[in-house]
């Protein structure tokens, strides 16, 4: 009884569906973009920077570079000039998609056993990272340059203006950054790195959200 019911129900569903109308006609799209722009970033300062760059006539690439420069300042736990990244550029007019690899590369002296300790065991994550052995050769600035030469519209210097202004005049620390500073302090990581502690404790006082 149940099997017959399921079979009839399936037939009913299939019969109730409208047939698809297939056509060989190709859809054409306008090659003029008139839909404005949208910016998404991890911090409002970076979003505002990207919007300002676009309003000045900059390209999406200009906006992305300027926004990332600001992110390196306002969220140093996640971004910065010491790392790497990718660029994926879509040209609306030509329909071309271009990928640029700007990730870090291993140092010339890197060896297969560089993360092995003298007793033959592998370093833990927290042993390897502060040792200096985990540092790759940064690729982000070269990525900026390559992308800007290919797709930039504004002068190179214009992309740094907001980051320089915020670094010179200050910015509101996000709760996330304040949390990471607290975490690093409780783990004793800032004590082991006087330079980092001085940066996050200007005038001897911890940065606050």
Model regions and ranges:
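Sec-dependent signal peptide recognition
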Residues: 2-9
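Noncatalytic scaffold domains of N-terminal-nucleophile
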Residues: 19-48, 52, 60-61, 65-209
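C-terminal motif of bacterial Sec signal peptides marking the signal peptidase cleavage site
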Residues: 15-16
